Regions:
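Conserved class I S-adenosyl-L-methionine
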Residues: 1-46, 49-58, 144-166
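Class I SAM-dependent methyltransferase SAM/SAH-binding core
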Residues: 59-104
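A C-terminal cap/extension of S-adenosyl-L-methionine-dependent methyltransferases
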Residues: 97, 142, 158, 162-163, ...
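A conserved beta-strand element that flanks and buttresses the S-adenosyl-L-methionine
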Residues: 116
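Acceptor-substrate binding/catalytic loop of class I
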Residues: 124, 166-181
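A short glycine-rich, Lys/Arg-flanked "PGG" loop and its adjoining helix->strand segment in the class I
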Residues: 128-142
Length: 240
């Protein structure tokens, strides 16, 4: 596990030096639309008085918007370089940044009302991370995550072909998820009311002139049996 964490710290340094937003594809017009959709998926469940743990906050792309909910946000990452950028991007009084390993959290059990994150679980040793998430949640606490879908053809190639992985700026150990095994793992960990839905057919490199039409078509495909399984991402919700 320590070797994996060391690689992620090194990867965080790479992202900080080379522009995380570009590597993560949040900066393009289509990328910004995809980002906004994920923000809503995570933040719409939060509100004042809630204690929320954000895993893998990175440069604070999502932290800033989560803070607008009024919840008390503890935003964590293993990378000090990314956390420094996050602090500059969002210095809201209801946000606290900490260096933490998501697979070995220092928090007491039953501390958080919700644990959230975007594109973070696939960087972790998933079994250990889910046990820690479950432990730090309050009874009836909830999780909300968006993660890459291994059934998507581009994602499958990107996560499994080493030279492609390097070209896209992935970290060495990151992967993606098949939703049914992930669902079973969540249930084995103790979570209930597990829902995992594929979503997002909009590619971040989509030309501006085509974004509206392709986004609408993608939303249509998300409701099509079988075809929806090949969407680019998974929306994960569950209750302790």
């Amino acid at each position: 596990m320590q070797d994996r964490v060391a690689k992620e710290i090194q990867h965080g340094r790479f992202l900080a030096e080379h522009g995380a937003g570009e590597i993560w594809n949040w900066e393009s017009p289509a990328g910004k639309l995809r980002w906004a959709r994920r923000v809503k998926m995570l933040s719409s469940h939060l509100g004042p008085g809630m204690s929320v743990l954000e895993l893998g906050c990175g440069t604070g792309y999502f932290t800033r918007e989560l803070a607008r909910s009024g919840a008390e946000i503890v935003a964590i990452d293993v990378s000090p370089e990314l956390l420094e950028i996050a602090g500059a991007n969002c210095s809201a009084p209801n946000v606290r940044y900490e260096i933490q390993n998501a697979s070995a959290l220092s928090y007491p059990g039953g501390m958080f009302d919700a644990v959230v994150g975007s594109s973070v679980l696939h960087h972790l040793g998933i079994e250990e991370a889910l046990r820690e998430i479950y432990r730090v949640l309050k009874p009836t606490g909830t999780i909300y995550f968006t993660e890459p879908n291994m059934l998507n053809p581009q994602i499958a190639i990107q996560k499994n072909v080493p030279w492609v992985k390097r070209k896209f700026g992935d970290s060495p150990d990151e992967t993606a998820f098949f939703r049914w095994p992930l669902r079973r793992l969540l249930e084995i960990t103790g979570f209930r009311d597990v829902r995992i839905d594929p979503f997002d057919f909009l590619h971040p490199k989509t030309p501006i002139a085509l974004i509206d039409r392709l986004n609408a078509f993608g939303r249509f495909l998300e409701n099509m049996p079988v075809i929806s399984e090949f969407a680019g991402s998974l929306y994960i919700r569950a209750v302790k």
